[in-house]
């Protein structure tokens, strides 16, 4: 893994490196089960993350990692190098603030990470992304996060059309800049005109309505 990290580091000028370390559903199973039985899954996780973060710091990088696992035991953040940034993510329209709160209370440096709602969808969940991004940016301000990282994923072969993520990307810029912004419909009209060249100002509202018509998503079609 460290050799792979060094190969990747050589390709980018940034001083940041995201080791990911999220959704570790299989940790403590298979070959790692005896060690997990001895140490516990959370200890197994944090020891490995710590080793990679310390390696990155020694290489002059600022480590980042996704926070979905550590939020179950947020006090473990104190064991990581002080340069480490926790990427606290959540993509629901009514995303709860628990994860952002507990990581802030534990003293973590964190970015709040909403999403544009395109992955596994025929059409981006436009209204969902508007609500999610507004909420997560609000949590970022409330808990003094160091930044916002707006995400766009491409699960299961990236069926989602990249151009349809533009509204969510613009919502991220708008809400991370400040709390006072236009309502959903008004902002969508501006995005339609400026990002898509639609003089009627209705294109993004049509996108939002199209998303509401979906009977099943790409995950259901592809996996289930």
Predicted regions and their residues:
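Substrate-binding groove of N-acetylhexosamine-processing glycoside hydrolases
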Residues: 2-10, 14-16, 23, 35-224
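Short acidic/His/Gly/Ser-rich catalytic and metal-binding motifs that mark active-site loops
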Residues: 26-31
């Amino acid at each position: 893994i460290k050799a792979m990290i060094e190969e990747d580091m050589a390709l980018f000028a940034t001083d940041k490196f995201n080791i990911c370390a999220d959704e570790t559903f299989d940790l403590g199973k298979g070959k790692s089960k005896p060690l997990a039985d001895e140490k516990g899954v959370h200890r197994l996780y944090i020891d490995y993350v710590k080793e990679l973060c310390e390696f990155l710091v020694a290489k002059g990088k600022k480590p980042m990692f996704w926070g979905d696992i550590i939020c179950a035991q947020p006090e473990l953040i104190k064991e990581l190098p002080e340069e480490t940034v926790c990427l606290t993510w959540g993509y629901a329209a009514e995303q709860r603030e628990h994860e952002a709160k507990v990581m802030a209370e534990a003293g973590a440096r964190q970015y709040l990470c909403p999403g544009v709602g395109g992955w596994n969808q025929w059409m981006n969940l436009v209204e969902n992304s508007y609500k999610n991004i507004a909420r997560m940016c609000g949590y970022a301000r409330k808990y003094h996060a160091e930044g916002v990282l707006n995400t766009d994923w491409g699960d299961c072969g990236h069926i989602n059309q990249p151009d349809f993520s533009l509204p969510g990307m613009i919502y991220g810029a708008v809400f991370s800049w400040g709390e006072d912004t236009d309502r959903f419909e008004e902002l969508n009209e501006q995005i339609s005109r400026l990002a898509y060249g639609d003089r009627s100002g209705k294109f993004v509202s049509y996108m939002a309505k199209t998303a509401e018509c979906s009977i099943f998503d790409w995950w259901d079609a592809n996996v289930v």
